[in-house]
Amino acid sequence: MKTPLTEAVSAADSQGRFLSSTEVQAASGRFNRAAASLEAAKALSAKADALVNGAAQAVYNKFPYTTQMEGSNYSTTPEGKAKCSRDVGYYLRMITYCLVAGGTGPMDDYLIAGLDEINRTFELSPSWYVEALKYIKSNHGLSGDAATEANSYIDYAINALI
């Protein structure tokens, strides 16, 4: 899994050199932000159920047809609603992984790589997940540096969807 730190080390090693002062400075900056990232990951994990349920409800409110149309990709049944919550939870989990890793590697490797194909195959609308992520961003309750760190990965996920 790639992170800015592993990328810097890999580049230096492949070139047979020590880390440059710029690379060391970037690593130092990451370590300075690490406490806020870990705080955000912990808070999002603790609130995961409430955030996921609220985000799913936000999708149903904005796109009421998702609870009215028949089909396995809609939320007309308890199973369909469970799938929606599972998918929203997966996005939230990837965000917490990115916060812990200090980079977008987990999301790039485990989510974004096949996102278009999955959405197309299962006829899932990216706008549903954008709405869910906007809800999470507006309701996570974080502030300060922890909010800044979390919001950067939420925005990254949103931008991958649009």
Swiss-Prot record:
Q: State its location(s).
A: Cellular thylakoid membrane
Instruction: Report TM segments.
Output: none
Keyword set, alphabetical order: Antenna complex, Bile pigment, Chromophore, Electron transport, Membrane, Photosynthesis, Phycobilisome, Thylakoid, Transport
Q: Do you know which Pfam families this protein is assigned to?
A: Phycobilisome
Q: Name one GO biological process term.
A: photosynthesis
**Is Membrane there in the keyword field?**
yes
Task: State where (2R,3E)-phycoerythrobilin binds.
Answer: C84
Processing after translation: Contains one covalently linked bilin chromophore.
Q: Does the keyword Endoplasmic reticulum apply?
A: no
The terms describing its cellular component in GO are: phycobilisome; plasma membrane-derived thylakoid membrane
Which InterPro entries is this protein grouped with? Globin-like_sf, Phycobilisome_asu/bsu, Phycobilisome_asu/bsu_sf, Phycocyanin_a
Membrane topology listed for this record: Peripheral membrane protein
Q: Which SUPFAM superfamilies match?
A: Globin-like
Homology family: Belongs to the phycobiliprotein family.
The record describes its quaternary structure and partners as: Heterodimer of an alpha and a beta subunit, which further assembles into trimers and the trimers into hexamers.
The record's function comment reads: Light-harvesting photosynthetic bile pigment-protein from the phycobiliprotein complex (phycobilisome, PBS). Phycocyanin is the major phycobiliprotein in the PBS rod.
Q: Protein name, please?
A: R-phycocyanin alpha subunit
